[in-house]
Amino acid sequence: MAELGELKHMVMSFRVSELQVLLGFAGRNKSGRKHELLAKALHLLKSSCAPSVQMKIKELYRRRFPRKTLGPSDLSLLSLPPGTSPVGSPSPLASIPPTLLTPGTLLGPKREVDMHPPLPQPVHPDVTMKPLPFYEVYGELIRPTTLASTSSQRFEEAHFTFALTPQQLQQILTSREVLPGAKCDYTIQVQLRFCLCETSCPQEDYFPPNLFVKVNGKLCPLPGYLPPTKNGAEPKRPSRPINITPLARLSATVPNTIVVNWSSEFGRNYSLSVYLVRQLTAGTLLQKLRAKGIRNPDHSRALIKEKLTADPDSEVATTSLRVSLMCPLGKMRLTVPCRALTCAHLQSFDAALYLQMNEKKPTWTCPVCDKKAPYESLIIDGLFMEILNSCSDCDEIQFMEDGSWCPMKPKKEASEVCPPPGYGLDGLQYSPVQEGNQSENKKRVEVIDLTIESSSDEEDLPPTKKHCPVTSAAIPALPGSKGALTSGHQPSSVLRSPAMGTLGSDFLSSLPLHEYPPAFPLGADIQGLDLFSFLQTESQHYSPSVITSLDEQDTLGHFFQFRGTPPHFLGPLAPTLGSSHRSATPAPAPGRVSSIVAPGSSLREGHGGPLPSGPSLTGCRSDVISLD
């Protein structure tokens, strides 16, 4: 019990680094804060205190608090009686009780040596390196050896020597391959590896900090530094095996020397080893994977049934499962579907592409779930092999609850041709009329006015909207009369009138002309003007929609608001109007818009025939006015 209490006291005095080393030595999790690490170490001490763990605790404690020894002059002080000094002068230690005198209190500042030096690390610890899939070990040239710290300096140095046997030398020389550029490579190589000096499990490659390696006096190239993850962080190299074959002496009589320089770290030791290996390719590993065999398809079917089994406690049940036959790495159809045994998904990836990717940069990470997928855990899925062989024209399948599957054909969606957007007021669309032969049933045109309320009692069903053929009715515009007739704030649209000569009475009665009050009364000086006399041609027909609307009170006042009668507008018209139309047109009532043109009765009688000859203004521009 006393020894257990002493060990507990030692553990409680450890720092984070010592606690991590102790937990790593025992194979426990060494991540967490100091109080968590301390609790784990104390639990380890209470639960299973093996002799090796006790020795490790004592070793770490001796490193943490090294004991000091006395020099020759200090040992002479111990032979004197307490309270006296070598020269008879009062000693400063005379006032200290003899029981409190320890060897550590008698040490000088520069005469400190270890009374019990720490136990040296084993030269050949029981360290095993993790096997590499792309390298096959042929022999061990240097067993895993500890990079021991021999001094208290920051930088350490170690020397190693190895020699090749004639058989090993012959293997290297026969594997030589000449590469482009006068370079030669060897498939059988001399490989140098570093790792942590831990015996709990097979160790991965791990470089010591500030590592420099010289082989036979020549500096060995190392992998480049990785970019630092944060500012101020010390750059690190990617830990991987080092090929020292180009620097080695390929001789059976001359040994090879290796000099290693690194920075020592308290509580962390490293190990070095040299192997003779044969480098493999992705194709060789694929053949080895095929040689392992294909997994029984029933395993995958059982996994599918397990995933699709309805959970009674869940309200949502999965009845089918879609899986792609495309490789997530190359976006191509699978050829050798494989996945790791540790993966819980059904999606497979192509084994050839996966091995080629790891040959360039070994990560061994599943491209589907981003979990570790080492080469030893890869399997070829037999169910997917059957699917690929039986279904060659689909890229996706669907699994059912019973483990069966069916191909998912890609649906070709018909392209929808969207009609061009219509323009005009109230969403009305007007389509151009094709000149040519038209059927007689299309001569009657129906116009739907959206301004009439749809809830009228007279209409049982809304009339079908039809497109009106268009012709342009020319209305003269006087030269130099800009601003004489201007539109108001309401937008104006284009007048569309049918091309035929007669219209039905239903069209004339459907025009809601009584709902448009005049915007402004007309002045007395332009009420007697007849604008139809200024049309360019005599044979031009008036549009019935224009003729009818001119008789109503909202004719042009809704679209043209008169803002004044400038003298330059009425000046050129006075001679013409006085000689031609002033006598033929009766005086209209003031304030009616129809007085601008003519009385409605006279226009209705002659709208179907040609107009009488009359003067017209040269250079007049035809305009189109909308009445809807």
Curated annotation (Swiss-Prot):
Tissue-specificity statement: Widely expressed, with highest levels in lung, kidney and spleen.
Cellular compartments annotated: Cytoplasm; Nucleus; Nucleus speckle
Gene3D superfamilies linked to this entry: PINIT domain (2.60.120.780), SAP domain (1.10.720.30), Zinc/RING finger domain, C3HC4 (zinc finger) (3.30.40.10)
GO molecular function, one term: transcription coregulator activity
Chain ranges of zinc fingers (SP-RING-type): 312-393
Motif (LXXLL motif): 19-23
Gene Ontology terms: biological process: negative regulation of DNA-templated transcription; negative regulation of gene expression; negative regulation of osteoclast differentiation; negative regulation of protein sumoylation; negative regulation of transcription by RNA polymerase II; positive regulation of gene expression; positive regulation of membrane potential; positive regulation of protein sumoylation
InterPro entries (UniProt xref): PINIT, PINIT_sf, SAP_dom, SAP_dom_sf, Znf_MIZ, Znf_RING/FYVE/PHD
Limits of the SAP domain: 11-45
Maturation and modification: Sumoylated.
Location in chain, cross-link Glycyl lysine isopeptide (Lys-Gly) (interchain with G-Cter in SUMO2): 46, 56, 230, 307, 466, 482
Pfam families xref list: PINIT (PF14324), SAP (PF02037), zf-MIZ (PF02891)
Region (Disordered): 72-95, 573-618
Start and end residues of each stretch annotated as Interaction with CCAR2: 1-200
Pathway: Protein modification; protein sumoylation
Binding site for Zn(2+): 343, 345, 366, 369
CC annotations in GO: chromatin; cytoplasm; dendrite; glutamatergic synapse; nuclear speck; nucleus; postsynaptic cytosol; presynaptic cytosol
Record domain PINIT: where: 115-280
Matching CDD domains: SP-RING_PIAS3
Record remark: domains: The LXXLL motif is a transcriptional coregulator signature.
Sequence similarity: Belongs to the PIAS family.
The name this protein goes by in its record: E3 SUMO-protein ligase PIAS3
Organism ancestry: Eukaryota, Metazoa, Chordata, Craniata, Vertebrata
